Structures are given as C-alpha cells and as structure tokens.
Amino acid sequence: GLYEVVVGVLGGGQLGRMMCQAASQMAIKVMVLDPQENCPASSLSYHHMVGSFDESTKVEEFAKRCGVLTVEIEHVDVDTLEKLEKQGVDCQPKASTVRIIQDKYQQKVALLPAWIPLPEFMKIDDLKAKKWDSLDIHFMIKSRRLAYDGRGNFVAKSEEELSSAVDALGGFDRGLYAEKWAPFVKELAVIVARGRDNSISCYPVVELFTGHICHIVKSPANVNWKTRELAIEVAFNAVKSLEVPGVFAVELFLTKEGEILLNEVAPRPHNSGHHTIESCHTSQFEQHLPAVVGLPLGDPSMKTPAAIMYNILGEEEGEHGFQLAHQLMKRAMTIPGASVHWYDKPEMRKQRKMCHITIVGSSLSSIESNLAILLEGKGLHDKTAVCSTLLGFIMGSDSDLPVMKSAAEMMEMFGVPHEVRIVSAHRTPELMFCYASSAHERGYQVIIAGAGGAAHLPGMVASLTPLPVVGVPVRASTLDGLDSLLSIVQMPRGVPVATVAVNNATNAGLLAVRMLGVANDNLLSRMSQYQEDQKEAVLREGDKLEKHGWESYLKNS
C-alpha cells in the first residue's frame, strides 16, 4: 500500500467510517476501536476491535497493533495516551493537545498567547455577583468537558437565570465556565490541515446553519472576501499554535461589526467538512490520514463552484424513523448534483445524525433551490433544468428595452433564469451601487448591462462587482451609437467590460451563456447544439441558393 503502517482510530462512528472509505482509495490500512460491534466503521475498516476508547487496557491493547494512533472523537482517555507516548507510540494529535481541546476553558486559555480573537470568558466556581461584572448580563454558561452538538451550553440573560443555568448543567462540581454572549450574525467554520512537515492548508470558509446540531453547511460562505480572509487567518493561526499534524475544524462567529471570534476547535475531521468529499479536490478525510502519517497534503480548493450539506437527523424512534430518513434519501436521488452518505447506524434515535446529503452546483442559489425542492418532497426529474437566477439584465432606461430584449430572448431559448431591471448610473447611483456590489451574493454569475449616450452603466457596474460584465452599446439619437461604443469599450486597465457591437444584445446573451457554460455542462451542450443549428441553417441557405439561383432566392426570401 501507499503507507504500510496501520493507522488506528479511536472511535468507529460516521467520521471513522468516512476515514475508512478514504483510506481504501489510498491503500492505507485503518483499524478502529469502538464498543459497538456493528458501529458505522466496522464493515469498512481493516479491522474492528470491540472495546471502549476510554478504557485504558483496551486502548493499550489496540495501540500495539497500530503504527499511528488518531481520533475521530476527542473524548478519549488522555492519561492512557500520555502513557503510550512515553512508550514510543505515535499519537496524532498529541495527548497534550487532546487534553487542552477536551477542556473548552483550557482551550481558550491556550489560544490567548497566539492573539486569537475570542469572546470574553472566565472560570467560575460560585455565584458571587462580583465575578460577573466583566461579562455584563447576557452570557453563556458552558460545560468545560463532554460538551458537543449544543449540549452543555445554557444561555443566561439575567441574574435570575444564572442559578437555573448552573443547575441545568449539573452544578459547579461538573466544571463550568462563563463566556460573554457574542452577538454574531453568522456562524462560520474553516477546516485546516497541518502536515508533519508543518505545512498548513486551509479549506474555503463555510457557513453553518444550526439548531445546536450542525444541520446545514454552505460552501463557500456567503460573506465578502475580507471576511473570508480574516476567518482563514484566525483559523490558520489557531492551528499553527497547536503544533500537531492532522485535520482541525475551527468554528467561528462573525459579528455585526465584521469581527471574527473563535468559538472552538475540534482536533479531527468535522461535520462542517463533509461537503469536501464531493466539492473539493481533496476531502477532509483524504487529508487527515496523510497528515498524521507524514504524507504530503492534498489540494483543499473547491472543484465545484458551490456546495451545500444537509444532515438527516432522526425524526422518530425505531423503524418509523428509518422509513422517514429513507424517504428523504430517495428524494435526494432525483436531485441533480446530490450525493447520499448513509452512516449505517443500527439504532434510530431522535436528533441523531443518521446521514448527510451533499448537493453541488454552479452557484449557491441553484443548490439552495435544489435543497428546497428536496425538503419540500418534490422530485426533480428534469435534470437539465437550471434552478435559479444566474444572470442579471440592467439598462439605464426603458428606451433601451427594445434592444436589450434580444439578450433576454437568448436566455429564454437556453433556459437560463434571469432578472431584468432598470438601473441608471446617473439618476439612481445608490441603487446601482447596491445592485452591483451585492449581485454575487444573490447568486448571479454574469451581468449584462446596456446603455446609450454617455453609457457609464456597464463600466461603473464592472468596477463594483467581481462578476463578469457584458456591455451592450445602445444606439442613441445622435452619433449613431459610436459614443456608446467608445464609452463602454474604453475602460481603464483593471476594470474589464466585455463589449459587443452597437445594439447587438443577441451576442451579449450568447456570450453570457458561454460564460455560464464553463461550469454548467447542460448549457455547454445547448451552446454546442446552437452552433450546430447555426451551421445547418447556413448550409440550407447555400443549398437553396445553388438550387434556385440568386434572382429566385431574392424574390422568395
């Protein structure tokens, strides 16, 4: 195989299962230690040892058969890992790192020297009011250990709620800490891989939509580039400070002021990275195994423009719960770009993660539409359909519409949903600014802008959006459209506008379809057919001319 030493994984849940799937593709042998005989990873692993990953004797016995020991869950027996490391066992991540991350309070203390932005927090062991002054009234009471999927957290919005929060979490003896409420507007996450050579690779920033349990993940996150860069910087520095190889999930808060705050770190593959199996050149599981054994890291970039991951959670107990989950899986099979990952858990419980569905597509808006169709229970059988608005048409005045309608007709012919609006660069500059600067966030991929006379609209829009802009010079009442053409085509370096001929909105539409076709095989196929139809039309005209002669041809044309 690629790597002869056996990798041992403490835990055989769905993360262990997907590690085994990735390992089989790379010819890496993976053993799992899990107490459940028919755990999700059991049937796919090189070997499954039945036993608890927090039982010292079992972990020691397991480690004897492994060259590298890693985890799919951080709640393991760290004392045993430290003992094994002293005996020469290669544990990745290191026991010291797992110990820090197990305790969410110590995790934040450890990150402070690296200047990682964090919500205000403090250790608590009683209800003395003076200790709470720095955190104001609105705060989170959190369990330091064994807290995940929203468990172990309690919001306290008043002093009266504080006592209830402590009681709900099992009292101070369990180990609690307080964190000032972070008024976030989005929850983000970054999967970060670190190799044994200290190389670090970051996956694209994703957006989480949760009800405590991670439920929906969108990639890339619908945030501006500055926010993405800041999120990646925080995640990179957090993992760099931990100084151990492997894949880490860094969960973040985005505040209304645009600040990024670190929520927590997991030292393993994570639910927020499941989409990478279909959406990225190297999945988080294909990344974790090479990282811990010392092989090169892969490419974390996306190979599809957008992806969304949806967790199927148990809705009911027992057989009925399985039936409901299977119905949703069957519907997913009718959705273009959808992939189903069943975890093969033997028992159905409410709110238990049983499966995830990943949908990839040409834009976030298109995959959001497909997810809505899935959740509404409607099968999508026309797999050639484009599901959402991909293109925006704007013009400076309704007098431009007779010209611009030709581009709209092209969109209708190719089946590309589009939005047509009047936006004037001179009379509605605020509207133009909002439209152009947010177009990519609304899922648009191309903008066609038509203007006559001064014709500043296409260029101004191009200066405000990262999307490609196609400019249509509209013939005005003077100068026969030459003024419009020169205004649009003479853009300064760094602000490109793809400009077509005067009044040739048809070509603008066709060019936009070709741009969209780069990431849409259906549109690319339709464009190829359009070109073939054009060729056939010219050949028919040529045959007709040769057959009837030019005089007859002109009379009948």
Curated annotation (Swiss-Prot):
NCBIfam families: PRK06019.1-5, purE, purK
PROSITE patterns the UniProt entry points to: ATP_GRASP (PS50975)
Localization in the cell: Plastid, Chloroplast
One annotated Gene Ontology cellular component of this protein: chloroplast
Catalytic reactions on record: 5-amino-1-(5-phospho-D-ribosyl)imidazole-4-carboxylate + H(+) = 5-amino-1-(5-phospho-beta-D-ribosyl)imidazole + CO2
InterPro entries to which the protein is assigned, alphabetical: Ade2_fungi/plant, ATP-grasp, ATP-grasp_carboxylate-amine, ATP_grasp_subdomain_1, PreATP-grasp_dom_sf, PurE_ClassI, PurE_dom, PurK
Renumbered residue ranges of the record's region AIR carboxylase catalytic subunit: 387-557
ATP-grasp domain residues: 108-293
Single Gene Ontology MF annotation: phosphoribosylaminoimidazole carboxylase activity
Swiss-Prot/TrEMBL keywords: ATP-binding, Chloroplast, Decarboxylase, Lyase, Nucleotide-binding, Plastid, Purine biosynthesis, Transit peptide
Taxonomic lineage from the root: Eukaryota, Viridiplantae, Streptophyta, Embryophyta, Tracheophyta
EC number of the protein: 4.1.1.21
Family of the protein in this entry: In the C-terminal section; belongs to the AIR carboxylase family. Class I subfamily.
One Pfam family, short name: ATP-grasp
GO biological process terms held by the UniProt record: 'de novo' IMP biosynthetic process
Annotated protein name in UniProt: Phosphoribosylaminoimidazole carboxylase, chloroplastic
Residues at which ATP binds: 132-189
Listed pathway(s): Purine metabolism; IMP biosynthesis via de novo pathway; 5-amino-1-(5-phospho-D-ribosyl)imidazole-4-carboxylate from 5-amino-1-(5-phospho-D-ribosyl)imidazole (carboxylase route): step 1/1
Location, primary (coarse class): plastid
Organism: Vigna aconitifolia
